[in-house]
């Protein structure tokens, strides 16, 4: 049995119907999966009537409320409510291809060393964005590493580590995550929370696999369409996003008990100019360069919090 969990906050209702219809169109027998919709403090609450597509398809589903705003809190509600061996997290803008769940279950059952895995996350074919944005797509959870399986069991990030969108996770891995967040102080809360663009919660979840001696994997047979809002391709949004990534990296390393090098004795202007000089060598556009410098500034901000604490 698969537990398919959709954590949502103020979803686009038209797109949400597409996401639900994709679940209704799955080739996997309806008695092999259950859908859980977790409403995370939406201004207009999700109602049972909004899930009529699932009901009409004969899918077993439940609607849960997560009143405390934050993706981490919504996922914790989902984990606590479910009981299956495998959980799939589906974002409210993830359109699963028809064989997604059947393939996920097959891979889970035939690969006992897997702790978590995901696949290709593709943009709709009619998506338009500036050319420079292409290099930034991985930071927007757009991923296509080709058709070769990638897997590993090492305690650091690599292309085998799946984003949270469409991620398939063994319950034991999520139990490690639950134990970890139970001891976290508010300053270490990762994941989206309102307008906050902190991230790395996905990495915190998947690192639990390594602690159990299980692998993370990229499985290219899995595909979903990631419907992103046009604003996410803007320079302003990507600057904010990468700044959040830089902060999140420091927070994640501290949560995992790893040392973080503090940056000392430099003025902000000196720091920025040195980083631009360094980044410009490895980037394809000035916009990409400045976005990566925003990552560095996020790292600087959070690492200095260590010095001041």
Model-identified regions with their sequence ranges:
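Short, flexible, basic/aromatic active-site loop/helix in glycosyltransferases
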Residues: 137-159
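N-proximal low-complexity "stem/linker" segments adjacent to membrane-targeting elements
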Residues: 1-25
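Acidic donor-binding loop at a coil-to-helix junction in glycosyltransferase catalytic cores
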Residues: 184-205
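Acidic donor-binding segment of Leloir-type glycosyltransferases
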Residues: 20-65
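Conserved donor NDP-sugar-binding/catalytic core segment of glycosyltransferases
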Residues: 99-133
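Non-catalytic, C-terminal membrane-associated alpha-helical segments of glycosyltransferases
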Residues: 240-244, 257-309
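Short aromatic/hydrophobic "clamp" motif used to bind/position activated sugar donors
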Residues: 87
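Glycine-rich, basic loop-to-helix element that forms the pyrophosphate-binding segment
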Residues: 66-82
């Amino acid at each position: 049995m698969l537990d398919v969990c959709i954590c949502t906050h103020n979803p686009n209702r038209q797109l949400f119907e597409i996401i639900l219809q994709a679940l209704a169109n799955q080739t996997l027998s309806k008695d092999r999966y259950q859908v859980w919709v977790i409403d995370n403090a939406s201004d207009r609450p999700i109602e049972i009537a909004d899930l009529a597509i699932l009901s009409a398809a004969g899918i077993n589903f439940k609607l849960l409320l997560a009143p405390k705003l934050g993706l981490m809190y919504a996922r914790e509600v989902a984990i606590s409510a479910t009981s299956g061996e495998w959980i799939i997290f589906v974002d409210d803008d993830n359109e699963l291809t028809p064989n997604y769940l059947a393939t996920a279950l097959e891979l889970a059952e035939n690969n006992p060393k897997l702790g978590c895995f995901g696949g290709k996350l593709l943009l709709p074919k009619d998506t338009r964005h500036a050319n420079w944005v292409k290099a930034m797509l991985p930071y927007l959870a757009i991923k296509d590493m080709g058709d070769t399986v990638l897997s590993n069991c090492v305690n650091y990030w690599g292309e085998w580590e799946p984003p949270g969108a469409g991620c398939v996770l063994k319950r034991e891995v999520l139990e490690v995550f639950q134990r970890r967040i139970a001891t976290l102080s508010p300053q270490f809360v990762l994941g989206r929370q309102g307008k906050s663009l902190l991230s790395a919660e996905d990495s915190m979840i998947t690192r639990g696999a390594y602690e159990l001696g299980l692998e993370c994997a990229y499985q290219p047979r899995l595909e979903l369409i990631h419907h992103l809002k046009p604003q996410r391709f803007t320079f302003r949004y990507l600057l904010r996003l990468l700044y959040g990534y830089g902060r999140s990296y420091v927070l994640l390393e501290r949560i995992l008990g790893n040392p973080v090098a503090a940056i000392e004795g430099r003025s902000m202007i000196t720091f920025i100019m040195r980083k631009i000089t360094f980044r410009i060598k490895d980037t394809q556009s000035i916009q990409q360069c400045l976005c990566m410098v925003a990552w560095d500034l996020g790292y600087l901000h959070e690492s200095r919090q260590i010095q001041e604490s």
